From Swiss-Prot:
Keywords recorded for this protein, A-Z: Antibiotic resistance, Cell inner membrane, Cell membrane, Membrane, Transmembrane, Transmembrane helix, Transport
Organism, as annotated: Escherichia coli O6:H1 (strain CFT073 / ATCC 700928 / UPEC)
Entry annotated with the keyword Membrane: yes
Name of the encoding gene: mdtL
PROSITE patterns for this protein: MFS
Protein name: Multidrug resistance protein MdtL
Length: 391
């Protein structure tokens, strides 16, 4: 079992590493490529677009051909794209490399969640996804620090060579450690069960909405945090970095505590707690009389996301044994596209950073609480009872 957990964690971590590690080198990258930092900030959106594009096909291929045939090319593409970025001499080539990086990371991301669905029951999967969420929270803190240390002695290209090395590690794990987990092709008697795993299942759609809104909350916070903390609240750059590190610490602590909480409370209780924390955060930020109270509201955001997201993802994947890859892809596409659409629309309409965050917090909490309370899970899927995997 440990081999599946290690491989899944490694596959997922390419995604945040690809986002956060290069940011520290952005000024030098812009200077070398004769582009402005503003022009290269689009590299974040291009990377996410690559991930979304990969998710359009990766899930279906993973369900038809297996998890390894998607993970191995995905890791290989991430390696090639990282090297391509390091060799880019124009901003256009750099952005093309970032898109390819996103494609590779997206393939690996989809496979990771499908593997966890294949190998873990509902309760254990919720615990593992909560732990995975905590580990993922470490990357936005450690990756820029690692990038800074690398750039003390090496050029910005070394950041992408480091990502390539990470990709090589994931590729080796996928080739030699990971075993295929895709359920065997269903017999004729299992066809009704396969056909019943519809993506239009009300329970699944409700969890897609909940997780998409939750990701929109956390990405809105990350996207607006420089404006909120430095421009509006007046913190210096060093203080901003400290605050973000502390919020990551809150996220990690809550994420690592959630598996223990699942041994005491029902998953539904933790999901309700998550949304109540979001609502409390929105109200706190809306009426905050001081910076201290606002910072408390921000910690509620991090705690709310960490306590509920892994549980919601586990519930979303629960109904799917034979179509776990497609379900994972659907979740990923909805989360990436939904959160990006919200941030883009809010910017186009001219909603300020503060109101953007408050608005998504309150909307997420109200909609999600209604869905949690009124959309009950269907008949438990028996698919995890005995799954015969390909060797």
């Amino acid at each position: 079992m440990s081999r599946f957990l290690i491989c899944s964690f490694a596959l997922v971590l390419l995604y945040p590493a690809g986002i956060d590690m290069y940011l520290v080198g952005l000024p030098r990258i812009a200077a070398d490529l004769n582009a402005s930092e503003a022009q290269l900030h689009i590299a974040f959106s291009v990377y996410l677009a690559g991930m979304a594009a990969a998710m359009l096909f990766a899930g279906k291929v993973a369900d038809r051909s297996g998890r390894k045939p998607v993970a191995i090319p995905g890791a290989a593409l991430f390696i090639i794209a990282s090297v391509f970025c390091s060799l880019a001499e124009t901003s256009a080539l750099f952005l093309a490399g970032r898109f390819l990086q996103g494609l590779g990371a997206g393939c690996c991301y989809v496979v990771a969640f499908a593997i966890l669905r294949d190998t873990l029951d509902d309760r254990r999967r919720a615990k593992v996804l909560s732990l995975l969420n905590g580990i993922t929270c470490i990357i936005p803190v450690l990756a820029p620090v690692l990038g800074h240390l690398i750039m003390l002695n090496f050029p910005w290209q070394s950041l992408f060579w480091t990502m390539a090395i990470m990709g090589v590690a994931v590729l080796m794990l996928s080739l030699f450690i990971l075993k295929e987990t895709r359920p065997a092709a269903p017999a004729a008697s299992d066809k009704p069960r396969e056909n019943s795993e519809s993506l239009l299942n009300r329970f699944f759609l409700s969890r897609v909405v909940i997780t998409t809104l939750s990701v929109s909350v956390i990405l809105t916070f990350v996207n607006t945090s420089p404006v909120l903390l430095m421009e509006i609240m007046g913190f210096e750059r060093g203080e901003y970095a400290t605050i973000m590190a502390l919020t990551a610490g809150v996220s990690m602590t809550v994420s690592f505590s959630t598996p223990f909480a699942l041994g005491i409370f029902k998953p539904r209780t933790l999901m309700i707690t998550s949304q109540v924390l979001f609502l409390a955060a929105g109200i706190t930020l809306a009426v905050s009389p001081s910076h201290a109270v606002s910072l408390f509201g921000i910690t509620l955001i991090c705690a709310g996301f960490s306590v509920g997201f892994g549980v919601a993802m586990s519930q979303a994947l629960g109904p799917f044994s034979l179509r776990a890859g497609v379900a994972s892809s659907t979740l990923g596409i909805a989360q990436v596209c939904g959160s990006s659409l919200w941030i883009w629309l809010a910017a186009v309409v001219g909603i300020g950073a503060w109101n953007m965050l408050i608005g998504i917090l309150i909307a997420c909490s109200i909609v999600s609480l209604l869905l949690i309370m009124f959309v009950a899970p269907g008949r438990p899927v028996a698919a995890h009872e005995e799954i015969h995997h390909h060797a």
